[in-house]
Amino acid sequence: MIIFFEIWHWSWALLGCYLNLLLTYLAIFRSPKAIKSYATLIINFAATDFVECALDLFIQTRLVAVPGEAKLVYIFNGPCKYTGSLSCKVGLSFLLHCLTHSVWSLLISFGYRFYILHNPALSRLTLLKITIMFYIPSLVQALTYWTLFVPREKILPLAKQWFPYYDLETETGVLTGVIDLTNFVAVYAVAHICLPFFPVYITIFVLRQKIMKYLGGQSQMMSQDTKAAHTQLLRALTTQAIIPMFLGIAVLLYFSSQSGLLKSPILEYSIFSVAILMPALSPITYLYFVRPYRQKVKRIIRHPFKLLSRPHERATSNSGVFYSGDHPTHFSKPVIAVH
């Protein structure tokens, strides 16, 4: 069984790393002027998801929750087991902070789309400051959560009591855990990972409905190209909003395991195996919907070894940025600052 999940992590993590690196490159060098400010958020998404995929590949976590108790056991089966337990612990802490930052970033993206319907586009510096402000809670989580992990010598005797039916002594991965989830640092981390997801998700869909209502009410005042361009980016964001449901599933699996509702090694492996799908699939939305990105991807598929050819070329046109099915949607710069 462990072989299957190792292949799963390697496959999805490597795919996610490649797609997010590609998206970062395209957002920096191929973003049209019309979405230059928004490209800041795209780069934020891509960088966060790349780090998350790389860390998932590095640690490959099995989460064994102690049913009915505030305790967790972690088993790391990734390459980090060859670099020391500390690297596994810090790796998990930063992976979890990427998950939370991705959720906040999604909220920023939808909020910005709603904002620019009534206001001029924000500068890239302003968007960067907003992103950093939302990033601080996740950074605090990353810098503190790893300090809670106890060494193998301390967790193994306890884990054998909690799970006598597991042969944990022969476990080849790094064995560690958190023996007190009531600690303030642990409460902060678990709450920050699990609680914001569903309120943020509800807010995202409320914003989506407001944007759709506004576009419908302003349809006679907007040009067809402008409205179509907004609609296409909204579709990209909506698709991207569906993808984090994988994180929601992972959270529900964790609660099921922690509460004792479900108990299975497959469940323990599946929590992080499901979560990796979010950062691995997320970049596809922009690679498909943003026309210059999509055109570049097609050229890469035809000539896979020419990704970095002519990097000095930058997308300068404000037209044809978003795709509608197989046809480009043309718009001019006011699409970013619709009043």
Swiss-Prot record:
The chain crosses the membrane at residues 2-22, 39-59, 90-110, 130-150, 187-207, 242-262, 270-290. GO terms for cellular component: membrane. It is found in: Membrane. It is a multi-pass membrane protein. InterPro entries: 7TM_GPCR_serpentine_rcpt_Srd, Nematode_rcpt-like_delta. Keywords: Membrane, Transmembrane, Transmembrane helix. It comes from the Eukaryota. It holds the Pfam family 7TM_GPCR_Srd. Its main location: membrane. The keyword Membrane applies. The keyword Signal does not apply. Belongs to the nematode receptor-like protein srd family. This is Serpentine receptor class delta-19. The lineage of its organism: Eukaryota, Metazoa, Ecdysozoa, Nematoda, Chromadorea.
